[in-house]
Amino acid sequence: MRMMLRVSIPVEAGNAAVKAGTLGSTIERILADLKPEAAYFFADDDGNRSGSIVFDLKDSSQVPAIAEPWFLAFNAKVSLRPVMNPQDLATAGPSIGKAAQQHGK
């Protein structure tokens, strides 16, 4: 299942990693294990170093292995949610129409 991982690294932890010269290499190592479809990094609305990472979750038992590296390396906040690309949404179209017929007013 295609998932979006949102990661928010607190300023203090991010600064410590930058000063130690490990921020980039640690993120690269985590991403190498995750093998994401896409990864984007930015400053979030609270000024934290953050990322949105899209990857394939094969089984829910993978969640700890995906989240723990961020927790342990950066004391990061992590959230996960299923997402769709345009092709997924097109495939879902008939079920959306069926739900509208059955439950719409």
Predicted region positions:
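Conserved, structured core segments of small domains
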Residues: M1-K105
